[in-house]
């Protein structure tokens, strides 16, 4: 939790309680259903929660916005973002039912009211949203092809509607076909920890 407060000092008391509760909840659920590698669970706040919140370094979702988290796994980046933006609606989708169950149980346990869940493949989701977020789900070209149908034409945020991905490593080749619509933000500009040296937020206007 100290790590989160280092970078997000203005969290409300409710948000602090919700973030603080995540550790024990994920420890418990991860012992039953593996959604985070066993060796990485100790790094929950750095590698998963803070990483998810990297998206907030490029956008502050406005009240009433809608966001789909595609391939949410155990709830990342959707659950941390839903805590940070309580007036934004988040829809978390994953093709693996047991992972959706973990995310649902965690969200219910901390009292999140602005999240919905669906066990489905990306191709099956027909609703539209202001943004789609994801964390290293698949190559950019494949992801854009799948989610183009899910981006609403109605604009209400400072950034035009589109796709926001958390990715790592060398991405120039992957982003090349979309270079005129893509911007990359290096998270090592915001977060000091070694983990973020190669981590990026990739934004693509759709």
UniProtKB/Swiss-Prot annotation:
The transmembrane segments are none
Positions of S-adenosyl-L-methionine binding: 71, 76, 122-123, 135
User: Where's it found, cell-wise?
Assistant: Cytoplasm
Report which superkingdom the organism of origin falls in: Bacteria
Protein family per UniProt: Belongs to the methyltransferase superfamily. RNA methyltransferase RsmG family.
The UniProt keywords, alphabetically, are: Cytoplasm, Methyltransferase, rRNA processing, S-adenosyl-L-methionine, Transferase
| Gene Ontology CC annotation, any one | cytosol
* Claim: Cytoplasm is one of the keywords in the record: yes
* Top-rank EC class of the record's enzyme: transferase
User: What Gene Ontology molecular function terms does this protein carry?
Assistant: rRNA (guanine-N7-)-methyltransferase activity
Q: Enumerate the InterPro entries for this protein.
A: rRNA_ssu_MeTfrase_G, SAM-dependent_MTases_sf
Q: In UniProt terms, what function does this protein have?
A: Specifically methylates the N7 position of a guanine in 16S rRNA.
Q: Name one Pfam family in it.
A: GidB
What EC number(s) would the UniProt record show?
Answer: 2.1.1.-
Name of this chain's protein? Ribosomal RNA small subunit methyltransferase G
What CDD domains is this protein classified in?
AdoMet_MTases
């Amino acid at each position: 939790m100290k790590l989160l407060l280092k970078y997000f000092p203005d969290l409300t008391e409710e948000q602090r309680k919700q973030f603080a509760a995540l550790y024990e909840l994920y420890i418990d659920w991860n012992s039953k259903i593996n959604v985070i590698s066993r060796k990485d669970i100790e790094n929950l706040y750095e590698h998963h929660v803070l990483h998810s919140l990297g998206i907030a370094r490029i956008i502050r979702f406005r009240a009433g916005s809608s966001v789909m988290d595609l391939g949410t796994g155990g709830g990342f980046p959707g659950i941390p973002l839903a805590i940070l933006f309580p007036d934004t609606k988040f829809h978390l989708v994953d093709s693996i039912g047991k992972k959706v169950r973990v995310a649902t149980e965690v969200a219910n346990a901390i009292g999140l009211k602005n999240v919905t869940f669906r066990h489905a493949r990306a191709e099956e989701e027909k609703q539209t949203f202001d943004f789609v977020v994801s964390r290293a789900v698949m190559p950019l070209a494949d992801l854009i092809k799948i989610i183009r149908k899910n981006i609403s034409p109605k604009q209400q945020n400072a950034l035009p509607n589109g796709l926001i991905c958390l990715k790592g490593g060398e991405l120039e080749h992957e982003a090349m076909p979309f270079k005129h619509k893509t911007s990359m933000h290096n998270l090592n500009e915001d977060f000091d920890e070694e983990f973020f040296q190669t981590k990026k937020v990739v934004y693509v206007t759709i």
